[in-house]
Amino acid sequence: MLIDKMHLKFFRNHTDFDIDFGPGINVIWGKNGVGKTSILEAVYILSIGKSFKTNRVNEIINNRSKSLSVDGFFYDSENDLRISFQQFLGKSKIFKINGVKEVSKNIIGRFPVVLLSPEEEKTTKGQPSDRRKFFDKLFSLLSKDYLIKLIKYNSILKNRNNLLRLNSGYDVILPWDVQLSRY
């Protein structure tokens, strides 16, 4: 799918902003601090379901508002698709596809985006855990099955590690090890 246009409302320094994308390569340019990176961040949110810059909603919502919205309009040879994102301070994210509410995991992969920025240098030069995190994101975009298994794996690993911290016995940890071995 390709992005056709996008509307930002109270997203960082954009209070009410429309952008149309052309076919092929698009260049976003302007002075420092006008919101070029915010446009990329909004596209990323519509693709991945979260910001690449922060986990704190109050950093994304414009200080003149208590909410934000991003609407992206996408197309391919067969479909037109509208992905919407809303966030209110202190509330859960709301995603919609063509007006129907969706959980964020159903957004991932609809419109694949891979981010490579100077901050992502750790992907190539950083710790193995950083590379793993990058490729987990990439493969999750390409395969919903991978994403589902990754979520289950991380949940099992978290439970197992909690038991290890509590010095639980071998017989308590073994079932979690067995489950981990399936992934």
Features from the language model and the residues they span:
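Pre-Walker A-like glycine/lysine-rich segment at the N-terminus of P-loop NTPase domains
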Residues: M1-I45
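An accessory alpha-helical subdomain
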Residues: K122-Y183
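ABC transporter nucleotide-binding domains
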Residues: G24, A42, R110-P112, F134
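Nucleotide-state sensing region of NTPase/ATPase domains
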Residues: S47-D130, L142, Y146
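Generic alpha-helix structural propensity
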Residues: P23, V34, S38, N55, ...
